[in-house]
């Protein structure tokens, strides 16, 4: 996993989770507590976030809400002075990020005091990577189509043209997000954002929930991950909460996101989110990381789909993913002949069966378990149980 240096702030597996507080100088922003148009008031708000634990402050010049017309680069530049006056008045120490989709705005902001860029259009402006690389700054890249006016709308891309009809037919929403992050490449200091939130009319809350379930897959890029999940609808709906009551679900999801590999959490609730992120980091899996002459890193892989993402990055055979993960299942209520059938079926597959008095423990790779299911010569009840094993591509 590549670490990123953002103006001296380390981001990645070797560092604590980083908190990105939010300041908006756009009156259109839907979250009014973070909106300021007076630099002194804005600076006081930012100092408060820094005291609460914000490592990064993300400054938005316009609302990303799809209900509003997109500002031009010229209009964003007209709002930049307020943002610059604000950061000049801040007494606390933080990395300042400018949220923009335009390379002209990024160039001006970095030249005049900002430390990094947060591009919600995913390098739809083809000059954005060059500007960020020339300034040697970190840049957040959100999954997005190559369209400056439709950030995050990855399900609006015609993937049958961009990839192939066959690929598009079998691809899931998460596959679309993953492919969108590939578009237009990366800089050496790119941080990836899988675009949680209502970025298009076609996107569903379940799309976001599935992306969250499969968050570890995005570690396959080998780059730090940024998540923006604070009080989002896909979490609120689970618990039946409105925005004001959504802090507890946001904190629960924050701990889970960090445990699953997120490195930066964007939030309006800095103090509370800091604690949740630290809990997630504390209970994340401890993995081998040895940077010797021949480096060794244990990957955080729990499914074949996650393994396949890493194999893709390495340009290695994706078929190896089927043997990269072990699944363990307990069977109960097996007749003696079914226990014997399991043992016999597993003998030549690489799976392991540990028979017990009325059941058995079955362990193996998804490929081995599929072979067991195909060859076991037991009862109809055993065949039905084996057929229900979740050992397809997503597992």
Task: Tell what function each PLM region has.
Residues 55-58, 97, 116-118, 140-141, ...:
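Conserved beta-strand positions in the central sheet of alpha/beta enzyme cores
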Residues 353-395:
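C-terminal functional modules
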Residues 319-335:
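Short glycine-/aliphatic-rich beta-strand segments at the starts of folded cytosolic domains
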Residues 1-26, 285-322, 341, 387-395:
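N-terminal amphipathic alpha-helix/helix-capping segment at the start of soluble metabolic enzymes
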Residues 40-57, 89, 93, 107-116, ...:
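Alpha/beta enzyme core
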Residues 179-206, 311-323:
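Active-site rim beta-loop-alpha module in soluble metabolic enzymes
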Residues 18, 31-32, 36-38, 44, ...:
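Active-site-adjacent loop and "lid" segments of alpha/beta metabolic enzymes
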Residues 23, 49, 53, 117, ...:
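Conserved, mostly hydrophobic/aromatic
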